Amino acid sequence: MGLNLSHLYFLCAICNAHSMKLYLLQISLWIVYGFIHSALASPKVKRIFEQKLGSFFRYYRLLYNVLAIVLLIGLLWYQRLLPKERLWAAEWWVGGFAITLFWIGVLIALKALRGYDLREFLGAPKPSTSPTSSEFRTGGLLRYVRHPLYTGTILAVWGHFLYESTLQSLIMAICVTVYIRIGIVYEERKLVREFGDAYVEYRRRVAMLFPKLF
């Protein structure tokens, strides 16, 4: 028995509904990841763990980073399992631009990381006698944007989307960008509390993510 046109429409509707559920799950997973990542980094939650963990709290940031990496790998693995349907057939120059944008983002992010104390950034435990105060830095890429690591990340994920041109890569780019933008608000509140007028003046002079633009 052959399929008529109405049968084909019905099958397409089922497939589209199934795909939509997969993409909605992807969005939900990004939201959950962002919530966990932010909640565990909040001062209130960290104070609770500090009371519970005692001297072992010095491993908190290390465990936090390990958990973040494991969850991110799981999320990216799920994305790779989604149907890889291209939103458009990209021209060769689009692919070249996308690759260039991606690697510019990666290089900016790597350059930005060099401005951090990597042991502290990764969460390597320090002796209890080590000073905990951080230094207000404005050198290197921080002369041009306040959050160069986030600038590089945004360029990389959008370069990846332009190259892949799939719905799941678009969802990832949007989710990462929105999360970064929201995260900057809370991060800068913390920086203002920590550095006061010096950071307020710095924020007034220097762009957030893109020089002379934003």
Task: Tell where the protein language model's regions lie, with residue ranges.
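Loop-to-helix transition at the N-terminal end of transmembrane alpha-helices
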Residues: 51-67
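Membrane-interface helix termini and inter-helical loops of multi-pass transporters
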Residues: 48-51, 80-91
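Cysteine-centered motifs
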Residues: 12-15
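Interfacial segments of alpha-helical transmembrane regions
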Residues: 89-103
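Transmembrane alpha-helical segments that form the membrane-embedded catalytic/substrate-channel core
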Residues: 29-43, 74, 102-124, 173-191
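Core segments of transmembrane alpha-helices
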Residues: 65-79, 102-105, 146-156
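Hydrophobic transmembrane alpha-helices
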Residues: 22-36, 131-214
